[in-house]
Amino acid sequence: MRKINVFDTSLRDGEQMPGIALTVKEKLEIARQLERLGVDIIEAGFPASSPGDFQAVKEIAETVKGSSITGLARAKKSDIDSAWEALKSSAEPRVHVFLATSPIHMEHKLKLTPDQVVERAVESVRYAAEKFPHVQFSAEDANRSEWPFLKRIIEAAIDAGASVINLPDTVGYRTPEEISKLFEFVTENVKNIDRAILSTHNHDDLGMGVANSLAAISAGAGQVECTINGIGERAGNAALEEIAVALQIRSDYYQAKTGLKLSELKRTSALVSRLTSMNVPGNKAVVGANAFAHESGIHQDGMLKNKETYEIITPELVGATSSLPLGKHSGRHAFKTKLNELGFSGSDEKLQTIFSAFKQLCDKKKEVTEDDLYALIADATDDQDSTAYELTALQVTYGMNHVPTATIRLKKQDDREIEEAGTGSGSVEAIYNTLAKMTGGNYSLADYRIQSVNGGEDALAEVHVRIQADDFEQSGRGVAHDVLEASAKAYLHAVNRVIARKHYAKREMAKVES
């Protein structure tokens, strides 16, 4: 049975999704979880695109050793040099060089002739191969490229040193049948294809990203590029969890498998969802809240008699089962053991912070579940360097015939406390108007979402917001037993991240000028 390499691009292509802006520490946390999942290759970012991306790729390359780390680079020596500086400490450095090959891209974007495109591809791949032991060449918009030209440039790239050839459906246009024909053509007609691994990368614009990826695997692809929860620009990318489970459940058909630890899928999905503030739909295949729910009486009866009547995927396979909940009598050692099982690897100081929050929650809830713990971990592991303001007190007064008023106290980084009151048409607006006044930012609320971490009257509230700040959007999240407190925390989290992002940009600009 063939082994399919899994190339996760959640931290690069996935982060291009509008509203996602991860910090370096958040990217590192996701990368560590991808390593635990068993991902073969992690595309950590685009080092030449910004100082922040460079730093994230560099830190991930220095920290994660169980997966191969790669970075994106245009077919330019400066991009490849930047990628090398960021990735050279990786256990197995590799670079992902891309160049457009479709007529529309060559003519209107690159403004190059086909001969010039081949020349640039060869030059860049050869240069990259002098530095990196593994070079991947992507023919951008391959699925709208002319096949004879595609054959020519693939052969040239392999001769120049490319060990992986990626054929992306950049705009999500093709059908599974068309993808199959393309990969069969390349496999049968590219004379030196035996010296490279074929890779597939599919977008989901027509809802066929996963189907196209599986079709490519059937037609000879040995590597699949995908993202957790299918995140990505426009309609997103092919979802890693769906591809992996499809190959597992239908191994009889595909005769292929991954090396993933599938029991980490649910945990990985939850982490990415929380850090990106992108909710997973309840009916999402494999990792959605309803993926293993059966409401129909006939279905429930069948499930009680034999689970295989209506369940082709077990919750245990993807790690969707909930273990026994913790309670107020649980000790620190048992709590630490449980957090380690969930993938937490923070300092003792951070552990104590989460443990204290856990004990406070136990006073309000009879049972604390894994979902609660995930929320507490996410709330406590934010980058402390970005905490310009901390919420210390919140009081909201409202009634049917009264104007909602919020009184808020914040602590600044220098430990000074400030207090302010403000009004709004509703309680949440009163809170946000007051916070905007206190932080001095000209922010507009782009999105506000609330969800309970789990069911029940005593459930934790988790609020996700996106605020518009100048020319970019920034997400924030807040968790609390009270929805108004969670709302305040979410807004403040987003504001703190905006401030940290601006300070970082100023520091990098100062370095350049000096």
Curated annotation (Swiss-Prot):
It catalyses: 3-methyl-2-oxobutanoate + acetyl-CoA + H2O = (2S)-2-isopropylmalate + CoA + H(+). GO terms for molecular function: 2-isopropylmalate synthase activity; acetyl-CoA C-acetyltransferase activity; manganese ion binding. Keywords: Amino-acid biosynthesis, Branched-chain amino acid biosynthesis, Cytoplasm, Leucine biosynthesis, Manganese, Metal-binding, Transferase. Pathway: Amino-acid biosynthesis; L-leucine biosynthesis; L-leucine from 3-methyl-2-oxobutanoate: step 1/4. Residues 390-514 are annotated as: Regulatory domain. The keyword Secreted does not apply. It is an enzyme of class 2 (transferase). One of its GO terms (cellular component) is cytoplasm. Catalyzes the condensation of the acetyl group of acetyl-CoA with 3-methyl-2-oxobutanoate (2-ketoisovalerate) to form 3-carboxy-3-hydroxy-4-methylpentanoate (2-isopropylmalate). This is 2-isopropylmalate synthase. It comes from Shouchella clausii (strain KSM-K16).
